Amino acid sequence: MPPRHQLFVDMSAALTGFSPFQLHGTGMTAAYLTELDAILTEDLVDQLLAAFPRAVHGSAALEPGAVDALLEDPAWGPPARAITLMWYCGTWTRLPDAWRAEHGVRDHDTDHVVSTAAYQAGLQWVAAGAHPIGARQQGFGSWSFPVEDLAS
């Protein structure tokens, strides 16, 4: 795996709380990095990856508060939060106008679903112990289970 791709996965693992192995299992790592490059430009993505704490890039443990510091950073917090949402929901959320004015982005920076595969691979489903509605079957024999009473 190219070092840049590995840096993106390492940063994403810290942002999402999922391991690099789990993120690779979604099949979305390359697609999300490509999406990010299409929105921010490769140069801005490289700056973001460079801003991410160095400890995560090696075998050393991430310093406590490092992720919070990145999320709260005025320069890199907005794209870091958008990346986190992309992993969980399979959607890109448009960056704030002030950030866009300062850093510049491409026209692709709009609220949008990255792809149908991204929706299905969203970490929200794993976190909730659910399946993507309308995209995956519930499992063999699920038709035989009684309908859940939503009133209770």
Where are these regions (language model features)?
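Short, charged/polar micro-motifs that form catalytic or ligand-binding hotspots
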Residues: 1, 18, 22, 34-38, ...
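Basic/polar N-terminal segments that are highly enriched at the extreme N-terminus
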Residues: 1-3, 152
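Conserved short "hinge" loops at termini or chain/domain junctions
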Residues: 3-6, 10-33
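Short, compositionally biased low-complexity segments
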Residues: 4-9, 49-58
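Generic structural signal for hydrophobic core residues of well-folded globular domains
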Residues: 12-18, 36, 52-56, 74, ...
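Amphipathic alpha-helical segments that form the core helices of the histone-fold
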Residues: 27-55
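Mature-region segments of soluble proteins
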Residues: 58-152
